[in-house]
Each structure stands twice: as C-alpha cells, then as structure tokens.
C-alpha cells in the first residue's frame, strides 16, 4: 500500500511539475511578446537612410522629370571632400548637388529610384539677364545619405538665378541588347537639361 501511495504521490508530483513548467513557459512567452512588439515599433520609428545625416538640404526647386531620369537639385553648407576638388569649403558659398535617379519607366534596366552612375553633369547659374555667373562640372561622390553629383560653389552674390544641369549619358557603360537579357531603351544622344528657374539665394539667410 505504501508503495502504491508512493507511486501515486510521485505521479501527482510529476503532473504538478509539468503543469508548473507549462505555466512558466506560457508566462515567459507572454512576457516576451511586448519585447517583440517593442522591437517592431523601434524598427518602424527608425529614421530612413539620410534622415539623420546631420544636415538640412535646401531645394533649388521641384524635382524635374527629364528623359529616363528624375533630377533633384539641392544645396547646403560647404563640405570637406577627399580628395579635395574645386573650391575649398572655407572659400565656398555652398555645396550644390544633383540627385539623379532612374524614373519608373526608364527601360534601361535601372530600378525605379536607383542612382544613375557614370553620367557627366555640367551646371550653369545665370542671373535674370541671362548672363552666366558660374558654370562647371559636378563630380560624382558619396555622402552619408548616399551617392550624388556635387561640388562646392565659389562665393555667390545674393540674387535670383536660373540653375541648369546638363546631363550627358555614360561614355563607357554598355547595355544588353539581345532578346533574352536585353533592355528596351537606349541612352540619349544629346544632353538632357534639368532647369530650376527663379532660385533665390541670400547668403545672410543661411546658418553657415
């Protein structure tokens, strides 16, 4: 009888232990759920690339759709670059950028919004009389918010200007043309021009 009671008691103890472990496991799963939700929330609230870059871009105007490209023009404080090209930051009025991405219907094999490399991007800044006050070629470069074409500009007087980017196609960039792997589009043969008219520049209104 004692042996039977012992066996019964052992069985009950085993069942109780199993129940306790199951309850602990369920509680642990419940306790860990907020952590997963918290992680999801943190990911959702994380800044997108470039949002926390530490500088504020000012637009030259609205984005311009030209050919297979979407072109944005921005400017902000002069920057140091490696290697140093053009005007040093200390002698510059601003850093200007052409953000050039592929349009959704580009037919050149780029994904919509992809940076388009290998371009030659010339710029011209004209006063309202049509006189060119600055011109040159933007350089391909990377910043903390990604690749672009840019340059530090020499000192520029306050005024209202028309800014143009003249975009030439890649000179040594091949396209597949066969039926199996080829793309439908072809690179443009004449420079594409993205224009930003009536840009107002006031060096006393910026923080740098």
Name every feature range the model reports, one short phrase each.
Residues 19-23:
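C-terminal motif of bacterial Sec signal peptides marking the signal peptidase cleavage site
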Residues 24-46:
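Short, low-complexity, disordered segments immediately C-terminal to signal peptides
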Residues 90-94, 110-121:
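Short coil-to-beta strand junction motifs in C2/discoidin
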Residues 81-82, 95-113:
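Short amphipathic, basic-aromatic surface patches that mediate peripheral association
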Residues 134-143:
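Solvent-exposed serine/threonine-rich low-complexity stretches and specific carbohydrate-binding patches
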Residues 1-12:
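Bacterial N-terminal signal peptides that target proteins for export
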Residues 143-150:
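Aromatic sugar-binding surface patches on proteins
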Residues 168-181:
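Short acidic/polar inter-strand loop motif in beta-rich domains
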